[in-house]
Amino acid sequence: CCIARQICEGCICCI
């Protein structure tokens, strides 16, 4: 898991 963000279902690599 890269970063936990609400925008991405739980824990996903958002770039």
Curated annotation (Swiss-Prot):
Q: Which UniProt keywords apply?
A: Disulfide bond, Secreted
Q: Is the keyword Ion transport assigned to this protein?
A: no
Keyword Transport (UniProt):
no
Report where it is expressed, by tissue: Expressed by the venom duct.
Q: Which cysteine pairs make disulfide bonds? A: C1-C13, C2-C11, C8-C14
Query: Which Gene Ontology terms of cellular component type are present?
Result: extracellular region
Location(s), subcellular: Secreted
Please explain the role this protein plays, according to its UniProt record: Alpha-conotoxins act on postsynaptic membranes, they bind to the nicotinic acetylcholine receptors (nAChR) and thus inhibit them.
Know anything about its domains from the record?
A: The cysteine framework is III (CC-C-C-CC).
Protein family (similarity comment): Belongs to the conotoxin M superfamily.
Q: Protein name, please? A: Alpha-conotoxin-like Sm3.2
Q: Which organism is it from?
A: Conus stercusmuscarum
